[in-house]
Amino acid sequence: MADKALKVGIVGYGHLGQFLVEKIQSEGAEVGLQLAFVWNRNADKLKDSLPKDLILHDLSDFTQRDTDVIVEVCHPLIVKEFGVRFLSHAHFLVGSPSALSDGQLEQDLRTAAKQQGKTLYVPSGALWGGQDIQKMNDSGTLRALSIRMSKHPSCFRLTGGLLSDWTEGEGRRVLYRGSVAELCPLAPNNVNTMAAAAIAASKLGFHGVTGEIVSDTALADYHVVEVDVTGPDGFSVKTMRQNPAKLGAVTGKATYNSFWSSLLVCKGHGGRVYLC
């Protein structure tokens, strides 16, 4: 057990938030984590599973809690509204990195992290090889990056009714292919993997990384993420990740454990953005 437990604030109590809270409650003492607060838009959802003193009713009151790391697992709008403020108080693990497709917000968060000496953590989630992509980016050898995410249509949460007409057995349908910057607002809860890639590949950025989302009724048991990296002189790497997932699940099973592993890294890496 660590000498001093890191105090963690959890913002959001959906499937992932609940998983993290239960994990900290059951294993936190062993790994040096303890809950500072939990906030949910509907606080009634918290009262049967948490002590009253851990429930934060007004998110603006987070500054009144002694917190080392704030974890957002809620919605990109929370990142936009509170991200800079979070970084003035604690390290910030952003579970909705698609919010950073807003170029001004990304710059504001990077600036806040640098000025406050706090780390903006971006979880790699379902992205395989994120650290390698970041190394190529930093060394100037990354030429192109594209990511395809394929899921059963029930697993997408899209704006504008983009997939409202799907029928079981229709097969494969490409919903979008283009810049990740334009994709993020269409599928803010489904493209965090691509957002993490765009942050790792910061020289290409959200406008330079290509994203594709595919609806496929054959994918009843898995989410599939394919990453295609291009470097100089014909260098390329292609990976395919199959992540077990139930029908209707936005997040695959393996991503929960990946997120937990990311949280364990959040012990302070200076005033910068850090892929974990």
Swiss-Prot record:
<comment type="similarity">
    <text>Belongs to the L-aspartate dehydrogenase family.</text>
</comment>
<dbReference type="InterPro" id="IPR002811">
    <property type="entry name" value="Asp_DH"/>
</dbReference>
<dbReference type="GO" id="GO:0009435">
    <property type="term" value="P:NAD biosynthetic process"/>
</dbReference>
<dbReference type="GO" id="GO:0033735">
    <property type="term" value="F:aspartate dehydrogenase activity"/>
</dbReference>
<dbReference type="InterPro" id="IPR011182">
    <property type="entry name" value="L-Asp_DH"/>
</dbReference>
<protein>
    <recommendedName>
        <fullName>Aspartate dehydrogenase domain-containing protein</fullName>
    </recommendedName>
</protein>
<dbReference type="Pfam" id="PF01958">
    <property type="entry name" value="Asp_DH_C"/>
</dbReference>
<dbReference type="GO" id="GO:0050661">
    <property type="term" value="F:NADP binding"/>
</dbReference>
<dbReference type="InterPro" id="IPR036291">
    <property type="entry name" value="NAD(P)-bd_dom_sf"/>
</dbReference>
<dbReference type="Pfam" id="PF03447">
    <property type="entry name" value="NAD_binding_3"/>
</dbReference>
<dbReference type="InterPro" id="IPR005106">
    <property type="entry name" value="Asp/hSer_DH_NAD-bd"/>
</dbReference>
